[in-house]
Regions:
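Core catalytic lobe of class I
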Residues: 1-260
């Protein structure tokens, strides 16, 4: 097993490569990073100012039916999260990015949606720049809430979550050439055979330089990613170490921002 995939308990006496950044004792670490067990706001206080390039987080959603790890009610959510946001802003580098995956929720007892995540975005935009919003479409999501979707049939399946990209500067470190996708067959044909320059009904002029091969297509801000991998390394490792797995974001979702 490669070293970077090996969990290294700190009682092995192996040097933690991240001790220079934070003085807190990690619960465990690998060559790729350290995991800390505790109150995130308290642990972040030990991180130096302007030292982090990227923060990716998926905090507990304001769900009506509570998870065992705890959830804050929608009406209290914004103030609760701002306590973390202040620390995020402090530790983030000037050209760094904060990426937040946050799902929506329904108002209790009615087929109407809470606006808590939009209210949070408005507050965060007073502190950060809203670089871009992404939409995570998970085709494997269950048809919930059952009362409104499968019983009364008055709503459709909720399969999209917000992913918000925030930054301290309008120009955070980013390069979309690092997340290019394969060209469609139509685009491959245009590159090979050319394109007749003309004006589209929308008014856009499509010129010959449109056929330039840029090594891939720029992806949209809609991310179609399922999270049904029952044999993922995460679940395998939880089973190996007798750890109860928790809900998580898709690894593919994290990779989009780690490589940008």
């Amino acid at each position: 097993m490669p070293f970077y995939d090996t969990v290294l308990p700190i009682d092995l006496g192996i040097e933690n490569p991240f001790e220079s950044l934070i003085s807190a004792k990690p619960y465990y670490f690998t060559e790729r990073g350290s995991a800390y067990l505790g109150d995130a706001k308290e642990i972040m206080k030990q991180i130096p100012d302007s030292s982090i390039n990227l923060i990716v987080t998926s905090p507990p959603y304001a769900l009506v039916f509570k998870k065992e790890y705890g959830n804050v009610d929608a009406q209290d959510y914004v103030q609760w999260f701002l306590g973390f946001a202040n620390e995020f802003h402090r530790v983030l580098k000037e050209d760094g990015s904060l990426v937040i995956n946050i799902g929506g929720t329904w108002n209790k007892g009615t087929p109407t949606r809470s606006t808590y995540q939009f209210e949070l975005i408005i507050e965060l935009a007073k502190m950060f720049n809203l670089a871009q919003e992404f939409y995570w479409y998970n085709p494997a999501r269950l048809p919930a809430p059952a009362e409104w979707v499968t019983v009364r049939r008055v709503r459709v399946k909720d399969a999209v979550e917000l992913v918000i990209w925030l930054s301290k500067t309008p120009f955070p470190k980013a390069d979309n050439r690092r997340v290019l996708q394969p060209y469609s067959k139509d685009m491959q044909r245009i590159i090979e055979k050319g394109y007749v320059a003309k004006k589209r009904p929308s008014g856009h002029n499509i010129m010959n330089k449109f056929r330039k091969d840029n090594n891939g297509a720029i992806p949209p801000n809609v991310l179609q990613i399922g999270n049904t991998d029952s044999s993922s390394q995460y679940l395998q490792k939880c089973n190996e170490y007798s750890i109860k797995p928790t809900s998580r974001t898709s690894l593919s979702l994290d990779i989009v921002f780690f490589t940008s």
